[in-house]
């Protein structure tokens, strides 16, 4: 039996997606800011919403699980500490 790939949904990467016209319009209208300086209103609202949902004082958005793990490790260790991770 031959399995043919579906062309309706392609989850390989966000680089192969094509936004529809509505998505492009939403991106053009979106508020923008510099998240590095804590000035992006969208990221600020996301962090506030999620921290509120979880009953936490504050939140920190990171774009990947790998980055979240790195932040956690750096938070709990000092330079020169050793860590064994699986």
Locations of regions flagged by a protein language model:
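Glycine-rich helix-loop-beta junction characteristic of Rossmann-like nucleotide cofactor-binding loops
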Residues: 51-53, 74-77
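Pyridoxal 5′-phosphate
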Residues: 2-11
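Conserved N-terminal alpha-helix of the aminotransferase class I/II PLP-enzyme fold
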Residues: 19-65, 86
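Short polar catalytic/cofactor-binding loops
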Residues: 14-18
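Short, conserved alpha-helix that lines the donor NDP-sugar binding/gating region
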Residues: 69, 73
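Conserved PLP-anchoring active-site segment centered on the Schiff-base-forming lysine
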Residues: 75-86
């Amino acid at each position: 039996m031959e399995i043919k790939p579906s062309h309706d949904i392609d989850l390989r990467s966000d680089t192969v997606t094509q936004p529809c016209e509505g998505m492009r319009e939403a991106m053009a209208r979106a508020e923008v800011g510099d998240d590095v300086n804590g000035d992006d209103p969208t990221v600020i609202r996301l962090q506030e919403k999620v921290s509120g949902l979880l009953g936490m004082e504050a939140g920190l958005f990171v774009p990947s699980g790998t980055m979240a793990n790195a932040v956690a490790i750096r938070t709990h260790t000092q330079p020169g500490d050793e860590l064994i991770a699986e």
